[in-house]
Amino acid sequence: RDYESPEIRTKRIQQGVESWKELSEYGSTIGLKYLLWEPMSVPREVGETIQSAQRIQDFCKQGFTIPMKLCLDVDHGDVSSCNPEDTDPHTWIRHFKNDIQVIHLKQSLQDKGGHYPFTKEYNLRGKIVPQEILNSIKEANIKSCSLILEISHRERYPFESRVLADLKESVEYWRPYFTCGC
């Protein structure tokens, strides 16, 4: 319910950021170089639009001992937003180029319904193209970030029998983009 009230939502976000600030103080004492937070897809989970995520990131630039960086998920962003950029991973990459430390990769469909693998079936319908993501990273002049496959399967059949094959196919789909120096 708190996210439905702008005043209470802001207060809760600020409380969360204050907790992160305390974690940054501890993190600096144990040698961490940064902390991560991940913008999500719905208001209840925060950071669902570029504007909302930027607001939180701005709060995180105030008094942190170590920086708060972003874990950007190519499939996040609020599909109910009136701004089409809020579901465009390339816009997010360009906008947060100075804050991205990690990018979660998964195939993204219009329904935003899962952590889809990079298999022929999903790639035909999906919007995540490796070279386009890498081009956006390069154009944003991001010097270093970790790209992580974040693929999961429903714990149901027939998906259960496909897990390893889908993971292998996903790795093979991305492999040429990392072995060629692109």
Can you say where each PLM-predicted feature lies in the sequence?
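Active-site acidic/histidine proton-transfer and metal-coordination neighborhood
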Residues: 1-69, 166
